Design a protein with these regions (language model features):
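Short acidic-glycine-tyrosine-enriched beta hairpin
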Residues: 134-179
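A short hydrophobic beta-strand segment most commonly corresponding to one strand
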Residues: 118, 190-206
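Short beta-strand His + acidic residue motifs that chelate non-heme Fe in jelly-roll/DSBH
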Residues: 108-110, 128-129, 174, 181-188
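Conserved short histidine dyad/triad with adjacent acidic residue
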Residues: 98-111, 177-178
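N-terminal leader/capping segments at the start of a protein or of a new domain
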Residues: 8-70
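Glycine- and acidic-residue-biased ligand/ion/polar-headgroup-sensing regions
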Residues: 103, 114-134
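A short glycine-rich, His/Asp/Glu-containing loop-to-beta-strand
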Residues: 74-103
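C-terminal edge-of-domain segments
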Residues: 207-231
Length: 231
């Protein structure tokens, strides 16, 4: 299927503030991906991890193949008040997980530890808000090996860059190595749960979280909610 779908969502701002109208242009994929069993999906991912991993290579894989829906049921864990990260596959080079988003779920504003990332929507929809860090009072903490930042700032200046609507059949959301910072929301007014599939290279064990109200940032664990169900 090909074509363009224009969708307009009006999102209420803070009390007393202006209402913000966001227009999204959603490009559908040119052709439907091939549906394969989860074991084959994992085997193909494992094969990719043995070669040179590029942003385009994983992107091409995820638009070409999708996991058979019934195979994903055993990876789903739902909590009423927060999203869950459920591991499908992980080795030294790649990590694949299913994230379940209850109504109203929202992530904190966070980095990705300098790694590559890909997200494809399976059910529902998600709003991604992208940011850029302009300044902080601990710039020296970014000069470390093996992670994007030690965190610990008590003054942070951020700029919002844009907003993306992620839907099944739409373009993949990607994370690059240039310290992509974003937060993801399943808006309450949509009144539906959401499910997304994520791949990271390399696996992300921790990330920097930004609390703009308290003007601080800190590192926190990015471990999955439950162990892998793979055989």
């Amino acid at each position: 299927m090909s074509g363009v779908l224009n969708a307009v969502y009006v999102i209420a701002g803070r009390p007393g503030g202006l209402r913000k109208c966001l227009q999204y242009e959603i490009m559908s994929t040119v052709s439907a991906p091939q549906t394969i069993p989860v074991d084959e999906f994992i085997d193909r991912l494992r094969g990719l991890s043995e070669g040179v991993i590029t942003k385009q290579a994983i992107y091409d894989f995820l638009v070409s193949y999708e996991v058979r829906p019934q195979d994903l049921e055993r990876y789903k864990l739902w909590l009423p008040d927060r999203h869950t990260r459920n591991k499908i596959f992980r080795n030294e080079m790649l990590e694949c997980m299913l994230i379940c988003w209850p109504i109203g779920a929202i992530t904190p504003l966070h980095t990705h530890n300098g790694q590559l990332g890909w997200m494809t929507m399976l059910e529902g929809k998600l709003l991604v808000e992208n940011f850029r860090k302009i300044d902080c009072n601990r710039p020296e903490n970014q000069q470390v090996v093996g992670m994007d930042c030690l965190a610990g700032a008590t003054r942070i200046e951020m700029q919002q860059l844009g907003t993306e609507l992620c839907v099944p059949g739409g373009p993949l959301n990607t994370v690059d190595k240039k310290q992509t910072i974003h937060r993801i929301k399943n808006l309450p007014e949509w009144n539906e749960r959401a499910v997304s599939l994520h791949v990271y290279s390399r696996p992300i064990d921790s990330c920097v979280v930004f609390d703009l109200d308290a003007q601080r940032c800190f590192r926190r664990s990015a471990e999955c909610s439950v162990p892998s169900a793979e055989k």
